[in-house]
Amino acid sequence: MSPTQLLVPTYTQMLRAQSAWLDKAVAPRQAAGEEPDAAMTLRLAPDMYPLAAQVRFSCFQAMEPVHRLRGEPLPAALLALREAGWNADAQPGSPADAQAIIAGTLAFLGELAPDALDGGAALPISLELPNGTAFDMTGEQYARDWALPQFYFHAIAAYAILRHHGVELGKADYVPHMLAYVRPGTIPQG
């Protein structure tokens, strides 16, 4: 499987799901007369980033590999998105802001050619973390061992935050794209 075939559909499916999770988080708050923006400050633990950051990081992690696997520097707008994730406590934004970030990321991914990232499989990738830790790997290793796990970490954190705070989410909300593969007549009734 090529890097493009692996990453782009995965990111697209999960970001669409994440958008639906946000919708499910907002509706009951609005119905109860609560401020929906407060949902963006929810978190699992005091030392974890809030929901706003998890959404921003999910989108950052979906776009970062596109640039790295094409040998391009990360654009200023993408670095600003990561910075906004780091600063989400001070500026959590609103669910509408989060939806706009997701929509922009989906549009960006949707514009990619079917083989846009394939030339990067053997490309040497150097990744430096803010704490100074550095990794050297191939594009294939980067896609498999960093890009996908990092994306899923933040997507799952967003899901877990919402679930932990009472949003009615289940497995079908997490992997709605799997419904396309259901064998007819096999979904239990009731």
Where are these regions (language model features)?
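Mature, function-bearing regions of proteins
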Residues: M1, P75, A80, A84, ...
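Acidic interhelical loop/turn segments
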Residues: R29-T41, G110-A143, V175
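Aromatic-rich, lipid-facing transmembrane alpha helices and their immediate juxtamembrane interface loops
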Residues: K24, E35-A39, A90-D97
